[in-house]
């Protein structure tokens, strides 16, 4: 490519980022912010992909999708499924559960929405999670321990994920929960037809196999005090979760037999709810109301704006 100078002589135009003798690229970030025409030069800047930036769990979505697509090859002796599974579970120890119940904000942020349709990230996560369970893939234990003891209060997804990350670092973790089983809202809020209990149990057991201790049916303030916990542990993680429903701000919201969906689901999963009326009205049309409807086929749904 050539251009004309003021003297009318043609001189070659170059868009190279390197001068002769240079061995390192220059920093162009500031120029990109200062001048909108700088994008015409082939400059590459590392940034978080929109799918990954939309993931509350912080999964390396681009990483495990590259493995699934065959762009990044697994090491010798490792299947691509296991390699992708381990990349996925670096951040999230519940791929099989999340592949079933996550609302998938990553897919809303997917670049492919601008071309045709989103990449089925949630389905890939589901598949890799089930592969890990079917092939009994275990998490590697840390090579050394730190000698630090951490108490995790609450055995829901936050508490279990925290215990998982701490155990990988070599800390000694003990979980306290006032329920008979681990899982929190994954067990007592999400119905079994959405999260099969065998799947949930398998993913929880894989975390416990890292050497995590549990104290179930143990209520803080009744069975053990915070002073006792603080005296026995170097750190405490509070992961009680958001387990209370919010009633509608309308007259009659506190009338008899008017309950929040979370209260209904908890009572049903606890085994305390034996009978449901012949006609039930569910206000709302999202995932929680759908889970509630799944427990009874003779239900009238009223969806309010």
Put a short name on every predicted segment.
Residues 82-92, 124, 186-234:
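N-terminal Rossmann-like dinucleotide/flavin-binding domain of flavoprotein oxidoreductases
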Residues 152-176, 216-230, 244-246, 263-305:
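Rossmann-like dinucleotide/flavin-binding elements
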Residues 238-239, 260, 282:
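Redox-cofactor binding/interface segments in oxidoreductases and associated redox assembly factors
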Residues 171-187:
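Glycine-rich FAD pyrophosphate-binding loop
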Residues 249-266:
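A short, gly/pro- and small-residue-rich
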Residues 1-149, 197, 236-254, 273:
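Ferredoxin-type iron-sulfur electron-transfer modules and their immediate structural context
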